[in-house]
């Protein structure tokens, strides 16, 4: 019974991340109708490449692994010439990672809910364009 209790507690903690949701959203908030090229990848998955139109977004919900080691790396490039770019870790462990591409950089807001919303509170600049 003792081992079952330990297993049940461990399993419950691991599954909590799946219930709370995991995902990436990338929103194009660039000016002058610029498009945004994006490509993200993890050890097991590739998202894109795709072009996000001005004002558009890319959203992907997924399950992270039981050990909490899921990582996604992303590369974003500003259109139309795609001369400014940035590569960065877009997801680690859990939660919803809400990224906003703006003229002066790339902003992040982490959400601990089950779905993305349109709130922009708690955004902070995480990356600058190269």
Curated annotation (Swiss-Prot):
GO cellular component, one term: extracellular region
Keywords: Secreted, Self-incompatibility, Signal
A Pfam family of this chain: Self-incomp_S1
Compartments where found: Secreted
Gene Ontology BP terms: pollen tube growth; rejection of self pollen
Signal peptide range in chain numbering: 1-21
Transmembrane segments: none
InterPro entries registered for this protein in UniProt: Self-incomp_S1
Domain of life: Eukaryota
Family membership: Belongs to the plant self-incompatibility (S1) protein family.
Protein name per UniProt: S-protein homolog 22
Gene name in the database record: SPH22
């Amino acid at each position: 019974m003792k081992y079952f209790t330990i297993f049940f507690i461990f399993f419950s903690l691991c599954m909590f991340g799946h219930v709370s949701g995991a995902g990436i959203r990338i929103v194009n908030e660039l000016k002058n109708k610029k498009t945004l090229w994006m490509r993200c990848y993890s050890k097991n998955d590739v998202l894109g490449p795709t072009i996000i139109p001005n004002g558009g977004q890319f959203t992907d919900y997924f399950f992270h692994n039981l050990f909490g080691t899921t990582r996604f790396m992303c590369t974003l490039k500003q259109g139309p010439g795609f001369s400014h770019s940035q590569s960065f870790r877009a997801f680690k462990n859990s939660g919803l990672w809400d990224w906003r591409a703006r003229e002066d950089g790339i902003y992040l807001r982490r959400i601990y809910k089950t779905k993305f919303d349109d709130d922009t509170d708690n955004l902070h600049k995480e990356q600058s364009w190269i």
